[in-house]
A protein has these predicted regions:
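Inter-motif core of Ras-like GTPase G domains
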Residues: 134-186, 197-211
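Eukaryotic basic, amphipathic alpha-helical target segments in cytosolic regions
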Residues: 23, 27-31, 76-77, 180, ...
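Canonical P-loop GTPase G-domain recognition
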Residues: 200, 204, 208-209, 214-270
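Charged, alpha-helix-enriched surfaces in structured cytosolic catalytic cores
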Residues: 10-14, 50, 63, 67, ...
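Alpha-helical scaffold elements adjacent to nucleotide-binding pockets in ATP/GTP-utilizing enzyme cores
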Residues: 18, 68-72, 175, 193-197, ...
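Conserved nucleotide-binding/hydrolysis micro-motifs of P-loop NTPases
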Residues: 99-101, 150-152, 186-188, 215-218, ...
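Conserved G1/Walker A P-loop phosphate-binding module
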Residues: 1-154
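Short coil/turn segments at secondary-structure boundaries
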Residues: 35, 69-74, 84, 106-109, ...
Length: 270
């Protein structure tokens, strides 16, 4: 009987480098031989394993996703559009970079240094609606934020999409460390498409957090009704018995309007 194999300890400088070394040396060849990417997630690239933590933002149109990102970043960013109507019609990855410009989807998915090469499988219709927004700030130095199109209320509005919205959201969710689901506190509703998206993300339920945005104009009584209504709506969609952690405030650079709840909402912002 031969002696068991012994391996010299790997000299890795970080946990990310250790994961990359172990995945490349022991897992990737097995996945490739077993055609793992044909029936589940695609093979991971070096850039994906070494990428910064990712946060995915989802919500119906005009829920304040883009303003939320601007509030966190502290400045405008490339490809930013804010307005009462559905303004964000594509996916944007806010990342650290010196160019201060928006990199189109085709170029973004061609770069080996970016963790988005696998997105090319969704076709040119999606790539035309995807970009990387490079911005230097404290936020992007620590993580990557994914802004998404507003989820629309009716099926007719979604018929014009030439790409699989649910599949793309699922791809980002699989690689995200946190998923923020934003609601406008003035118009709580769960559309059919939003229900479909939440059901798609059941496997990533532990990553999800709720944000009730634009809440500073509401009274204490109204906030209680809004919170109760939101939990009632989502209770019919989420399958887990636990209540999701929720944050309630107005995430923009304007002063809070309700002095009675200013302290509470300031703490929620932090």
């Amino acid at each position: 009987m031969g002696k068991p194999k012994t391996y010299a300890p790997a000299n890795y400088g970080s946990v990310s480098e250790a994961l990359l070394g172990l995945y490349t040396g022991k897992v990737k060849d097995v996945e490739r031989d077993m055609l793992f990417d044909r029936f589940t997630t695609s093979l991971l690239s070096d850039a994906e394993l070494l990428a910064k933590p990712m946060v995915l933002l989802l919500g119906q149109y005009s829920s304040g996703k883009t303003s939320f990102i601007r509030y966190l970043a502290g400045k405008d960013f490339p490809a930013m559009h804010v307005g009462p109507e559905p303004t964000t019609d594509g996916f944007a990855a806010l990342m650290d970079g010196t160019s201060g410009t928006a990199i189109p989807g085709n170029a973004a998915t061609s770069s080996k240094s970016r963790p988005f090469r696998a997105l090319s499988k969704f076709g040119s219709a999606f790539l035309n609606k995807f970009c990387i927004s490079e911005l230097q700030c404290e936020l992007t130095d620590q993580l990557t934020l994914i802004d998404t199109p507003g989820i629309l209320a009716g099926s007719k509005q979604t018929m014009g999409r030439q790409y699989d919205f649910s599949a793309i959201v699922k791809w980002f969710a699989e690689r995200s460390d946190m998923i923020l689901l934003l609601f406008d506190a003035h118009k709580i509703d769960v559309s059919d498409e939003l229900k479909e998206i939440i059901e798609t993300l059941h496997a990533h339920d532990e990553k999800m957090r709720l944000v009730l945005n634009k809440a500073d104009c509401l009274s204490t009584e109204e906030i209680m009704h809004v919170y109760g209504g939101t939990m009632w709506f989502l209770g019919k969609v989420f399958t887990t018995p636990e209540v999701k952690r929720s944050y309630m405030s107005s995430f923009w650079d304007k002063p809070l309007k309700n002095p009675e709840l200013e302290r509470f909402m300031t703490e929620e912002r932090q």
